[in-house]
């Protein structure tokens, strides 16, 4: 069996935490989902308004995809996961088109696995609740101040 993690490298190494903890399933191989695209940077370029269409999200030619997944054995059971299942499902389809015959999507994804604290994981990092509370408090103070200023401005009219 081989485990394929298609999340970003930052999610894989635990820097981008999207569950109680960050990290990855032991032994997983990280090949980010976006690497399937002709231009893996398309999503970021769209967000930065550097481009106006998603043509770069088209799949690479089959030969390029075969090279991308050459570390994997197409005859082994392949478990694919991501954060929630969407990226894994699409990657599973790509693998099947490439001739992988035993592809499964781990439905619980990292969201379920990462929140199961007794499940083994590598590169474990934890969500910093204290920092979040501090930032939320500061944000609430700013909202309160802005509401006060708005009320005062309306009173002057």
Which ranges hold each PLM region?
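Rhodanese-like catalytic fold shared by cysteine-dependent sulfurtransferases
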Residues: 1-2, 6-157
């Amino acid at each position: 069996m081989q485990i394929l993690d298609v999340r970003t490298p930052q999610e894989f190494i635990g820097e981008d935490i999207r569950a109680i903890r960050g990290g990855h399933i032991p032994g997983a191989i990280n090949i980010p989902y976006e690497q399937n695209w002709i231009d893996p940077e398309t999503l970021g370029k769209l967000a930065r308004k550097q481009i106006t269409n998603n043509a770069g999200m088209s799949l690479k030619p089959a030969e390029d995809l075969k090279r991308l997944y050459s570390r994997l054995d197409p005859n082994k059971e392949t478990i694919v996961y991501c954060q929630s299942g969407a990226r894994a499902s699409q990657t599973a389809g790509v693998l099947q088109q490439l001739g992988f015959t035993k592809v499964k999507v781990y439905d619980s994804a990292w969201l379920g696995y990462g929140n199961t604290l007794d499940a083994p994981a590598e590169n474990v990092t934890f969500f910093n609740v204290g920092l979040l509370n501090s930032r939320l408090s500061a944000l609430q103070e700013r909202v309160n101040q802005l509401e006060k200023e708005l009320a005062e401005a309306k009173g002057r009219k």
